[in-house]
């Protein structure tokens, strides 16, 4: 049984930890608001670009000269999986959820006889996936020193992926990230970047419904410029969704940790008081017994 001194030290230690988790929860809540606003602001732009891309793709789908990023290599033998996770932990199952989703996809592709290559974005994803698939990880990127994710970070990743594609390193590229739904709900998502598949048709508003589009100089040339930018835009949106999801998970995890610390403090305090009461009772009995002996 721990002594009173041990219990007192443990209570003090848990209280100190509780202060830290409470502070981390407040910081995560403040960051979550900004991250959520950024993620929600990026969605309309990303969706509208997808609609424009789908419209132009329809115009050149049967034409010659379509860019290779759209048509692909004609094969699907080598797959590049770009797995985006957080740089740090203490955010519940956020990172493991994305890694598990990507790992299931890896197993499926390997079972089909495909060659798989992994590009990790974020330290935690690398740490998790290297335990089982270290030989498949061909590149990693960390954003630990980036205070706030910007389009330039996503653009650099997009250019690197395109560079690898043009060098013939893979046939299909899929992006894995966590789509932010709410503080307690983040959904692991896979998005094919290359070949650039036409997005689901987005319903046009009344002002543009039934409109006929003309492209200058031509649709294929526009696609050649638009697809690389769309890849960067989709990566940027994924990074923003990840930041919002990470902060939501961290806030929830730190809230649970704070409440658990409170419960532990109550139990330890109860144990301390009971032991102290028993010790005082024992001392009183000894004093009374000694007095009676006299």
From Swiss-Prot:
Functional description taken from the UniProt entry: Produces ATP from ADP in the presence of a proton gradient across the membrane. The gamma chain is believed to be important in regulating ATPase activity and the flow of protons through the CF(0) complex.
CDD domains hit by this protein: F1-ATPase_gamma (cd12151)
GO molecular function term, any single one: proton-transporting ATP synthase activity, rotational mechanism
Membrane topology type: Peripheral membrane protein
GO biological process, one term: proton motive force-driven plasma membrane ATP synthesis
Domain of life the protein comes from: Bacteria
Source species: Rhizobium rhizogenes (strain K84 / ATCC BAA-868)
Gene3D superfamilies: 3.40.1380.10, ATP synthase, gamma subunit, helix hairpin domain (1.10.287.80)
Any one Pfam family match given in the protein's UniProt record, by short name: ATP-synt
PANTHER family given in the database record: ATP SYNTHASE GAMMA CHAIN (PTHR11693), ATP SYNTHASE SUBUNIT GAMMA, MITOCHONDRIAL (PTHR11693:SF22)
Subcellular location: Cell inner membrane
InterPro entries linked: ATP_synth_F1_ATPase_gsu, ATP_synth_F1_gsu, ATP_synth_F1_gsu_CS
The protein, known as: ATP synthase gamma chain
Keyword ATP-binding: no
Family recorded in the similarity comment: Belongs to the ATPase gamma chain family.
A GO cellular component annotation in the UniProt record: proton-transporting ATP synthase complex
Subunit text: F-type ATPases have 2 components, CF(1) - the catalytic core - and CF(0) - the membrane proton channel. CF(1) has five subunits: alpha(3), beta(3), gamma(1), delta(1), epsilon(1). CF(0) has three main subunits: a, b and c.
Swiss-Prot/TrEMBL keywords: ATP synthesis, Cell inner membrane, Cell membrane, CF(1), Hydrogen ion transport, Ion transport, Membrane, Transport
């Amino acid at each position: 049984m721990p002594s009173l001194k041990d219990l007192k030290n443990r209570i003090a230690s848990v209280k100190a930890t509780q202060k830290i988790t409470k502070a981390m929860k407040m910081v995560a809540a403040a960051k979550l608001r900004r991250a959520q606003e950024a993620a929600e602001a990026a969605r309309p732009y990303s969706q509208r670009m997808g609609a424009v891309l789908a419209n132009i793709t329809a115009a050149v789908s049967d034409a010659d000269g379509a860019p290779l990023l759209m048509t692909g290599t004609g094969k699907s033998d080598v797959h590049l999986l770009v797995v985006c996770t957080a740089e740090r932990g203490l955010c519940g199952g956020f990172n493991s959820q994305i890694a598990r989703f990507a790992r299931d996809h890896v197993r499926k592709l390997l079972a089909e006889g495909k060659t798989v290559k992994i590009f990790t974005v974020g330290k935690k994803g690398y740490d998790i996936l290297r335990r089982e698939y270290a030989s498949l990880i061909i590149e990693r990127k960390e954003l630990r020193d980036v205070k706030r994710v910007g389009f330039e970070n996503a653009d650099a990743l997009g250019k690197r992926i395109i560079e690898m594609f043009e060098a013939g390193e893979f046939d299909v590229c899929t992006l894995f990230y966590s789509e932010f739904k709410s503080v307690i709900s983040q959904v692991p998502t896979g998005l094919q970047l290359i070949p650039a598949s036409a997005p689901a048709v987005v319903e046009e508003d009344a002002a543009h419904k039934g409109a006929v589009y003309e492209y200058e100089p031509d649709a294929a040339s526009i696609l050649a410029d638009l697809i690389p930018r769309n890849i960067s835009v989709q990566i940027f949106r994924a990074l923003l969704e990840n930041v919002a999801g990470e902060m939501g998970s961290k806030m929830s995890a730190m809230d649970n940790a704070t409440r658990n610390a409170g419960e532990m403090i109550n139990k330890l305090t109860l144990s301390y008081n009971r032991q102290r009461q028993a010790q005082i009772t024992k001392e009183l009995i000894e004093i009374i017994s000694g007095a009676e002996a006299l």
